[in-house]
Amino acid sequence: GLDYHDLADVIIHPDIDACFDTIPDSRIFAFTAHTEHHYHEVSYQDGDALLFGNEANGIPDEHLAHPRITRHVRIPMLPARRSMNLTNSASVAVYEAWRQLGFLGGI
């Protein structure tokens, strides 16, 4: 992001297990096109983690099968359409979770 680097706390983990070890009590929702569960059907809680894959391939199968994953969820799309890009998908999901939490900390 252009001028947002000072607002981000970026940590690069060596692997998915190391990442998950930093959030031991969090529920983890994996966003994938390969499920029938929609993202807005989740009752999000403070501390939940949202996992997204890259635009080309999504989340790798071995990560989707990880025992720490709480549920696979998807953002509905119109038939015969490609997917939204990662930024738009993350924005839709994060704002839904934040909305459910009453826009906690917002102005």
What is the predicted role of each segment?
Residues 33-37, 54-57, 79:
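Short glycine-rich anion-binding loops that position phosphate/pyrophosphate groups of nucleotides
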Residues 40-43:
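Adenylate-forming
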Residues 16-20, 36-37, 80-83:
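A short acidic, often aromatic-flanked loop/helix-cap motif at beta-alpha or helix-coil junctions
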Residues 1-33, 91-94, 98-106:
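RNA substrate-binding interface of SAM-dependent RNA methyltransferases
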Residues 59-64:
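Short, glycine/polar-rich helix-capping loops at beta-to-alpha or helix-loop-helix junctions
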Residues 47-48:
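A contiguous loop/helix-start segment that scaffolds small-molecule binding in enzyme catalytic cores
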Residues 66-107:
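Structured adenosyl-cofactor binding patch, chiefly the S-adenosyl-L-methionine
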